[in-house]
Amino acid sequence: MSIKGQVTSFAERVEIGERWAGGQSDREIALALQRPLPTIRKWRRRYQQEGRDGLISLMGRPATGALGQLRGEISDEILQMREVHAGWGPLTILTELKKDARFGGLRFPSRARIAAYLKHKQKVKKYEHHQELPEPPHPTLQRPHQEWEVDAQGKIAIAGVGSASIVNILDVFSHVKIDSLPCLRTTHANTQDYQLVLRRAFVGYGLPEQISLDHDSVFYDNQTASPFPTVLHLWLIALGIGVRFIHQTPPAEHARIKRHHQTVTQQALLGQTFAGQADLQKALTGRLLFLNTDYPSSALQGQAPFSAYPQAQQTQRPYRLEWERESLNLQRVYTYLAHGRWFRMTSSVGTFSLGAQRYNAGTKRARQTLDITFDPQTGELVCLPQKESTSFRLAVQGLSKEVLIGELDPLTTIPAYQLALPWSRQAWRESVLCLDLGDTTL
């Protein structure tokens, strides 16, 4: 239960009203939101009597301010403490004030008054309404390629090529090692790296039903409590692949892919020196073939994955790079986004960010929380400002096939595309993709 005296956000008040309208009792709402029952009752009544207009808080002291009756030295010291020690809360600041000999004999503000003053001076952290992304449930696995686990091993030192981050893909049910991709000269694989290894996997095996991911920033927006899907996430959705995020740290979830990282290191890397990136990739591919075809797995009663599950050598959904543009279905993305909801605070000039895109709500809506949903029929964001009862619409940005396809687009749409020497990461990725393209002359 939250501490008495904390202030509810506008998004929380909206949720209180909507939960009440949906049939939940005050006590059920208090338990779900971890807020005191009187707080729930207060805002539920406001919503019941006045609708959304009643949810705008009019809290605050008169113009004198939260510490208007106290000497300026104390208020100045409170601000100074908070600026120097951002982690100090009202209770810590009050305790430090009482120890300061300069303020001996003066009347001190209460902890609540200090909290109100810091809020008035905008020296407190803004708490956002938490809204999870829609996702499929954790499946009961019954067949190969029902779910792949995808994860990067992290930075490791490899003799001959330096440091690398290796991205691995594993089919959970059959234990087939799908692919491994070394990303050199980086500690963190990016969106294009993951698209490359996934495309290689799709070419080799076809499209899986579902992929599970952790909360790495490439997959998931960790900077907000109501995240918008990343480009990689939307690309998979457009291809008709379900995306599920793990909700427990390994080994509770993703234990297999973590063990697979160790297997790849032991089988392909330890004690080896490589002439370059192509040599390293060849070694990884060769050992994965050995593990899938020959190596007896204890989890499969001593059989290799392809022996235990011959059908795992190909999914039911074939894929080619040349087909990707036509395979991408933006309506799948629109349908997915229609189940989402996002809360964003506008800036002093009325702008806000959503999905790495910048939008302008207008200066009259500056410093307000927007309650945002998506209309799949028009492809627009529907924005309801905190201080208004009427929504407005903005055209969504960054949802074209060109944006989702990324580096593959020029390779498949331009009749003659001259590859650069593979000295940069992008040039190397393009050269790898071309190996899987039909009618390509290298």
Each predicted region: which residue ranges?
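Short, amphipathic alpha-helical "recognition" segments used to contact nucleic acids or chromatin
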Residues: 8-24, 75-84
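Basic, flexible linker segments flanking DNA-binding modules
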Residues: 55-150, 155, 311
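Mobile-element integrase/transposase regions
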Residues: 68, 72-73, 116-178, 189-197, ...
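Short, Lys/Arg-enriched anionic-surface-contact patches
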Residues: 1-14, 65-72
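Short alpha-helical "recognition helix" segments of helix-turn-helix
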Residues: 29-33, 93
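C-terminal, beta-rich DNA-binding module of retroviral/retroelements integrases
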Residues: 292-442
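RNase H-like two-metal-ion nuclease catalytic core shared by retroviral integrases
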Residues: 213, 222-266, 277-280, 285
